[in-house]
Amino acid sequence: MEKYENIKQVGEGAFGQVYKSRRTSDGAVFAIKKMPVDRETGFPFTAIREIKLCKSVINKHIIGLDEIVFEEGFIFVVLEYMPYDLTGLLASGAKLSTDQIRSITSQLIEAVSSMHGMGLVHRDIKPSNILLDCHGMLKLTDFGLTREISGMMTNRVCTLWYRAPELLLGETSYSLKVDAWSVGCIMLEMRLGRPPYRGSDEVSQIKLIFEELGIPQDKYKWSDLLDVDIYSKSRSTEEIIAERYGHLFDEEELKVLSGFLCLTSRKRLSVANSRYFTVISSHKNTYIPLSFEEAHELYTKERKETKKP
């Protein structure tokens, strides 16, 4: 990778590291994802999925792939560089305006809809995978868990705080609507300034959701293990959300939010259909500049570590 020089590390995960890097020939800046190639298993399957998705989905809100380089036991995936991810932005204390939040929501819905239109489910939509540039343009990234919808799939997907109830309850035959739940959680997080449901494991996560919203109308694989009936509510999800969050959203936004956070997956609002709400469609091509310092999840974590006594 002699033609690039690393500026700083901006991300890390089970896959490897992400660096902000400069191409020496022209000074262009990229994000380079560095992943080890296992001698026995070979090319990482998550990398195959990500590369395939970036090449197949042509949408301005999907991160762009520039090139792929193999070198010294590693694969380097060269992507567009974005100065913000939503986790870092929110954790940095940046105050997003109502219009900025609506713009981000609308763009995220467009990105996810483009995937769903091809029968692809992301399965790991979370703030750190939502990237933004200084103009307010959003790009969705990290497609290592993305796949085509089929009959039986693993339920061990999606970061815990953004995982749909049916996945937490053991469902293996699920739909694109698992992504809709994640989008709803992010809508709420941008207004609250924190993730709405922060469990420490699958059981505590589903209990937090049930305690606030009630229970699904359908039974899933593990429903009986949790005695879910004790969490039954007399009011609908729409009524509960309107009462709890009516001060944060207007009436139409509340309909979208309660649609995404519907516990019964077959009745949940699809991401594609949410585009027909005026509050979403009216912000479709609206980009509001961000004037904050660069902020990524890794930088935010490091700052928290340095503040510890």
Curated annotation (Swiss-Prot):
Domain of life, source organism: Eukaryota
EC number: 2.7.11.22
UniProt-listed InterPro entries: CDK, Kinase-like_dom_sf, Prot_kinase_dom, Protein_kinase_ATP_BS, Ser/Thr_kinase_AS
Amino acids binding ATP: 10-18, 33
Alphabetical UniProt keywords: ATP-binding, Cell cycle, Cell division, Kinase, Mitosis, Nucleotide-binding, Nucleus, Serine/threonine-protein kinase, Transferase
Subcellular location: Nucleus
Root EC class: transferase
Domain Protein kinase: 4-288
GO cellular component terms, semicolon-separated: cyclin-dependent protein kinase holoenzyme complex; nucleus
Active site location: 124 (proton acceptor)
Catalytic activity, reaction form: L-seryl-[protein] + ATP = O-phospho-L-seryl-[protein] + ADP + H(+); L-threonyl-[protein] + ATP = O-phospho-L-threonyl-[protein] + ADP + H(+)
BP GO annotations: cell division; positive regulation of transcription elongation by RNA polymerase II
Pfam families: Pkinase
Main location: nucleus
GO molecular function, one term: cyclin-dependent protein serine/threonine kinase activity
Xref: PANTHER family: CELL DIVISION PROTEIN KINASE, CYCLIN-DEPENDENT KINASE 12
Function according to Swiss-Prot or TrEMBL: May play a role in the control of the eukaryotic cell cycle.
Family, similarity comment: Belongs to the protein kinase superfamily. CMGC Ser/Thr protein kinase family. CDC2/CDKX subfamily.
Protein name: Probable cell division protein kinase ECU11_1290
